[in-house]
């Protein structure tokens, strides 16, 4: 194998590198230099070709587009250089997997034809730190220090040995191997009822065959909620997939969750309803962890648990699934021996069509050939190395391919015969068994096996039989992989062609690996030799389970806490500072919360944009007209305003919430189970629903695998079943075995008819009253945050279990109060107790509060008790009515305070003030942990809007002759929000996948196409390299570039690019920002934070802008969602000034009001420096935006709607899409056609 080496590319020093080298600076303990260290990057490329000379200049150009090369960089004798990166003889990193997948789609890499597409096998990058040692000579201890700080075992990085020659002949890399079969998860197997299936050996487990009923779903429970859902599929040149049109069908919404010890999303394949393929999924996440004792910035963010958190968030971002909710649980120090391991929770809220598309495999259908396909690459993933995890990009592409394929075969049930889901272990042999369902077998072809596996095999002969079987087990069957196996047969259609098309459009690797057979077990056939083909046979899958571990003893201390000795003010501040209670902006602001356009409620609410929401909302179907009308006004009218409306239609949604019980569960499984379910349901209590029976609870359980695990699991499920039956709600289960203590997460979903009626936690008015409603009268301090901060977590009495009767009654009362508009805000009582609940309501609403401790109550116990309940805000005019109503219903309640206009937090008892402090003090405490994770930022203030027009929209449906193309960039999910915004404006959207560079079919039709949108982002783990590689891929897409150039040249066609990757494509084609004298292009560069940003930004539309989409919005200041890693436009300063002077700046990041001016500080401008948020061409036809109006095209997508007079009833961003259609009406077919506007930037000399 040939190795190409590229080095000395400029790089910015990273925080952990700055920390590691700080000791080398002057006056440091290991001082050697008075200069700041510098860093460079390099790349090592493995090429499986004897002659790859054409690759060197192409790869060099690609890497230089990411960062400039330093050609004259020379090392002096006093320079200490230390390189670190992945071990070249070890596991392939996720970065390499993703980048190689992109590179293989570059036509420039395959000049000799498609057969050379697999020339590049691996691309790894490393970093080098250069230190000029002018004070002292470097010693070995300096190298050892850098190695200790930068080569942490959990990252998989090591002291990098740089090849001395650019071209080295090396042996073929050794494939990963697993000598013995991986152990299966016994709890997962039991909760799925898999012990009743043939082939599952009970001799390795404490569970006995037949003794464990299938309790995955209780017989009286339902799995899902049925609602209408809408979806889009891309246009395809085959007749198997539709023309990218909008479809509405009856669908199912369901939830599913599980725990893992490391960052992983593969459980998304193991849906609770795995026979329904998900059309769309959103993710809930949770982390249970310990943190190091030091809490300063670099030691905190560089710790293993926080690195795992960041890896998990990056994995989620790359999968194109929005993150809608989560929890963060810090393990108390006195329980560190019980919960030593990090636990990561993944929950999925998914939509599916109501079609049984997967039939169980059985022997009868095998009369027709049923083929096995592998979706995704055969890559092993390593739980111990964060750099070698599974690929989020690949997981997302598999899910997208399945959704596209489902739409093409939905009318042909039985097409999918089996799928590798619901697995006790993700080994290849287990996946094949799951597809076969233990009633048939699989025949695999040697020609379809991975090359690294085939390289290990000897010719199939009796003498080699034992060795070959050993190799196949060790290098194939026993390995944990992140791919998906699917069995398909043709049912009156060419299903295989449909799968191929769907995978191409989704950017998902696939190949045929074999077929199903009548013979049980697995056969491997060597079809590379002449017939008769030799065969190796393997027994069917028989999972083995780990040995039982010893239970960890839990000690309950008999000592008491003297609460009267504690200082109330200090105790409250410590509770708010606790990471389990405090602000989660360090997570929420750096995850993709909105990518699909279906998210109606994230965790961010209120004018202060704080993450305190109890629930999230997804909209399965956008409220737009899809039925074709006989006479569409867009066909014959030039003035469409008479058909416009000034209020958005109500939209139904699915509300989801989670409840978590880890600390309390260690002491009492039954109480912990009920507490998790109670919290999840109370988090939904502010959602108006019609019937409590519509709620579906999904309980995710993780227990240590000890001697009594079977009893414990049955206890948890029986407790949940009894409690849910009493509430009349449905309940489903999943279970996992993990090290350490138990954890239980309840995910609840319910449908609501109008998402705008849902109540948020932020206080709305001054002088309103706060009511506390509780499910029980006793204090709940055992295991509370108040006791955790004292390191006396398990002291006192374990709280009693919540009464389902009382909980149900309280929920019914709250629903009545919400529907008669007596409640204006509400928040559940959980971690941190009542004081944390009231503080979050005050902080998110920007209101002061006065809290009254009832006479005779202990103030600290009253305020810190975590008794399940809800605090509601009631205006003064409704106070007596609510009070009387609660009395009449025998609800436990107290009036515990009121809101005030003064920004103070006051606590009093019997007219004595116990605490009276500025609200800012409590906000600082609540934000302290988040600020420690990302310091040096200015927190946003409430935004003020200014709208230059009355927002309206025209709901008459799309005109089928006014087409707008929406290009779906590689490995991105379908932009439902954008498609519906375009359709709502009267256009007919046409979704086009451009993943295939070899595709030559043109999609532009000059008679019907009025414009095009490009939207998407890089889903490669390293954003810089990934984005440049994807741009190179799209530049080489012949048909796409041909259509793009044609449409850009048409004076009556508009274009809109949303996101950095899309903007780069317009810049590359010289549509915006090109300067001919200097031959410079505009470009997008990475945020100053070096992170993914998701911000609710204030956007100003300049009066001078020429953008046709913003003509009605000139001089408007409107908030909008902004997401991405590259949110900064770059051009030489004179060019940016010239663009602004010429009206080519279309939008700007602004402060909280017009008087604040353009934003200059992070995060008001998410990039940290530049205020420009959008640019346009000189004639205004072409628009490049870093913010995304399609994600806030409806008011229900806004985290907070500012109070206006009159109230805002239509999103102003609808005007943008309406203006585009109005412009098209005026220019399409105009005679003479629109004249070209000269671009002052083209000839500008600076």
UniProtKB/Swiss-Prot annotation:
GO terms for biological process: intracellular transport of virus; purine nucleotide biosynthetic process. One of its GO terms (cellular component) is host cell. Its main location: virion. Keywords: Virion, Virion tegument. InterPro entries: Class_I_gatase-like, Herpes_virus_tegument, PurM-like_C_dom, PurM-like_C_sf, PurM-like_N_sf, Tegument_herpes_virus_N. Signal peptide: none annotated. It is found in: Virion tegument. Pfam families: AIRS_C, GATase_5, Tegument_dsDNA. One of its GO terms (molecular function) is phosphoribosylformylglycinamidine synthase activity. NCBIfam families: tegu_FGAM_synt. This is Probable membrane antigen 3. The gene is 3.
């Amino acid at each position: 194998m040939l190795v190409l080496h590229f080095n000395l590319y400029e790089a910015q020093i990273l925080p952990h590198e700055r920390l590691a080298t700080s000791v080398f600076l002057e006056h440091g303990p290991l001082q050697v230099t008075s200069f700041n260290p510098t860093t460079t990057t390099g790349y090592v490329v493995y090429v499986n070709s004897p002659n790859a000379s054409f690759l060197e200049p192409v790869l060099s150009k690609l890497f230089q587009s990411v960062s400039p090369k330093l050609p004259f960089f020379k090392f002096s004798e006093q320079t200490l250089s230390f390189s670190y990166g992945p071990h070249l003889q070890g596991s392939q990193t996720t970065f390499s997997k993703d980048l190689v997948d992109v590179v293989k789609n570059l036509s420039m890499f395959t000049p000799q034809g498609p057969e050379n597409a697999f020339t590049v096998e691996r691309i790894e990058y490393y970093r080098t730190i250069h230190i000029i040692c002018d004070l002292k000579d470097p010693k070995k201890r300096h190298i050892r220090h850098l190695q200790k700080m930068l080569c942490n075992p959990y990252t998989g990085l090591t002291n990098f040995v740089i090849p001395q020659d650019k071209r080295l002949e090396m042996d073929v890399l050794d494939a990963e191997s697993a000598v013995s079969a991986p152990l299966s998860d016994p709890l997962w197997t039991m909760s799925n009822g898999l012990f009743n299936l043939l082939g599952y050996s009970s001799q390795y487990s404490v569970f006995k065959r037949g003794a464990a009923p299938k309790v995955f779903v209780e017989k009286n429970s339902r799995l899902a909620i049925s609602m209408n859902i809408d979806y889009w599929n891309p246009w395809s040149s085959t007749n198997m997939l539709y023309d990218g049109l909008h479809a509405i069908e009856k669908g199912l919404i369901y939830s599913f969750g599980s725990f893992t010890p490391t960052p992983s999303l593969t459980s998304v394949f193991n849906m609770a309803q795995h026979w329904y393929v998900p059309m769309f999924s959103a993710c809930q996440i949770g982390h249970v962890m310990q943190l190091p004792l030091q809490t300063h910035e670099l030691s905190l963010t560089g710790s293993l648990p926080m690195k795992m958190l960041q890896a998990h968030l990056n994995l989620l971002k790359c999968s194109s699934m929005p993150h809608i909710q989560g929890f963060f649980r810090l393990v108390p120090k006195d329980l560190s021996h019980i919960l030593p391991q990090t636990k990561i929770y993944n929950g999925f809220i998914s939509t599916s069509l109501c079609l049984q598309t997967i039939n169980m495999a059985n022997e009868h259908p095998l009369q027709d050939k049923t083929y096995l396909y592998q979706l995704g690459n055969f890559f092993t993933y390593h739980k111990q190395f964060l750099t070698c995890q599974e690929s989020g990009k690949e997981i997302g592409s598999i899910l997208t391919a399945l959704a596209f394929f489902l739409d093409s075969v939905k009318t042909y049930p039985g097409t999918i015969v089996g799928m590798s889901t619901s697995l006790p272990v993700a080994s290849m042999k287990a996946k094949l068994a799951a597809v076969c369902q233990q009633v048939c077998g699989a025949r695999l072809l040697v020609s379809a096996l991975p090359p690294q596996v085939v390289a290990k095999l000897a010719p199939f002969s009796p003498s080699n039989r034992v060795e070959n079987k050993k190799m196949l087990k060790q290098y194939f069957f026993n390995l944990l992989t992140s791919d998906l196996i699917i069995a398909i047969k043709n049912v009156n259609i060419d299903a295989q062609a449909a799968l191929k098309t769907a995978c191409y459009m989704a950017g998902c690797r696939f190949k045929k690996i074999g077929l199903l057979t009548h013979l049980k077990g697995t056969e491997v056939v060597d079809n590379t030799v002449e017939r008769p083909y030799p065969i190796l046979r393997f027994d069917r899958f028989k999972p083995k389970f780990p040995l039982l571990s010893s239970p960890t003893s839990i000690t309950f201390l008999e000592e008491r806490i003297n609460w009267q000795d504690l200082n109330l003010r200090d105790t409250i501040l410590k509770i708010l500072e606790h990471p389990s209670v405090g602000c989660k902006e360090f997570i929420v602001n750096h995850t993709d919360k909105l990518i699909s356009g279906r998210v109606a409620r994230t965790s961010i609410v209120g004018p202060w944009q704080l993450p305190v929401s109890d629930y999230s909302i997804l909209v399965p179907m956008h409220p737009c007209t899809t039925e074709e009308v006989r006479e569409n006004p867009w066909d014959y009218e030039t003035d469409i305003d008479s058909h416009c409306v000034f209020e958005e239609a109500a939209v139904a949604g699915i509300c989801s919430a989670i409840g978590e019980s880890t600390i309390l569960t260690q002491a009492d499984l039954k109480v912990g189970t009920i507490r998790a379910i109670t919290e999840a349901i109370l988090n939904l209590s502010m959602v108006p629903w019609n019937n409590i029976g519509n709620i579906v609870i999904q309980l995710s359980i993780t227990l240590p695998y000890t001697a009594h695990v079977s009893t414990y699991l049955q206890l948890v499920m029986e407790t949940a079943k009894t409690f849910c039956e009493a509430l009349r709600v449905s309940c489903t289960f999943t279970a996992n075995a993990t090290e350490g203590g138990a954890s239980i997460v309840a995910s609840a979903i319910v449908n609501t008819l109008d998402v705008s009626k849902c109540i948020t936690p932020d206080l709305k008015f001054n002088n309103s009253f706060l009511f506390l409603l509780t499910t029980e009268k006793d204090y709940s301090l055992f295991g509370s945050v108040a006791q955790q901060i004292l390191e006396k977590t398990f002291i006192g009495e374990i709280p009693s279990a919540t009464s389902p009767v009382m909980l149900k009654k309280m929920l019914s009362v709250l629903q009545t109060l919400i529907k008669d508009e007596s409640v204006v805000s509400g928040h559940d009582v959980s971690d941190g107790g009542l004081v944390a609940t009231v503080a979050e309501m005050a902080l998110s609403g920007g209101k002061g509060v006065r809290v009254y401790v009832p006479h005779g109550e202990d103030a600290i116990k009253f305020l810190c008790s975590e008794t399940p309940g809800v605090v509601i805000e009631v205006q003064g005019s409704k106070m007596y009515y609510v009070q009387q109503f609660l009395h009449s219903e025998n609800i436990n309640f107290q009036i515990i305070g009121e809101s005030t206009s003064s920004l103070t937090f006051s606590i009093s008892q019997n007219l004595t003030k116990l605490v009276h402090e500025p609200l800012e003090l409590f906000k600082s405490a609540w934000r302290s942990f988040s600020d420690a994770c990302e310091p040096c930022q200015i927190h946003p203030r409430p935004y003020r809007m200014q709208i230059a027009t009355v927002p309206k929209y025209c709901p008459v449906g799309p005109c089928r002759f006014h087409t707008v193309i929406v290009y779906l960039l590689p490995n991105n999910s379908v932009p439902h929000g954008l498609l519906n915004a375009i359709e709502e404006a009267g256009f007919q959207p046409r979704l086009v996948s451009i993943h295939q560079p070899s595709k030559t079919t043109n999609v532009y039709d000059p008679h019907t196409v009025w414009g095009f949108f490009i939207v998407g982002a890089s889903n490669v783990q390293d954003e810089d390299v990934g984005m440049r590689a994807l741009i190179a891929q799209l530049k080489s897409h012949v048909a796409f570039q041909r259509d793009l150039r044609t449409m850009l040249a048409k004076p009556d066609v508009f274009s809109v690019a949303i996101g950095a990757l899309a903007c780069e494509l317009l810049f590359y084609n010289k549509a915006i920002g090109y300067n001919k004298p200097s031959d410079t292009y505009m470009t997008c560069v990475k945020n100053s934070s070096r992170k993914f940003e998701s911000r609710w930004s204030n956007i100003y539309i300049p009066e001078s802008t020429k953008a046709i989409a913003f003509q009605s919005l000139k001089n408007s200041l409107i908030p909008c969602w902004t997401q991405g890693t590259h949110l900064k436009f770059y051009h030489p300063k004179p060019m940016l000034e010239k663009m602004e002077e010429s009206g080519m700046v279309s939008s700007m990041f602004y402060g909280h009001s017009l008087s604040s001016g353009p934003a200059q500080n992070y995060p008001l401008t998410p990039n940290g420096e530049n205020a420009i948020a959008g640019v346009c061409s000189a004639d205004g036809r072409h628009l490049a935006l870093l913010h995304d109006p399609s994600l806030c095209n409806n008011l229900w997508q806004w985290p907070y709607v500012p109070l206006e007079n009159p109230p805002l009833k239509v999103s102003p961003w609808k005007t943008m899409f309406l203006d585009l259609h109005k412009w098209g009406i005026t220019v399409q077919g105009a005679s003479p056609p629109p004249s070209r506007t000269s671009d002052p930037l083209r000839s500008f000399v600076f």
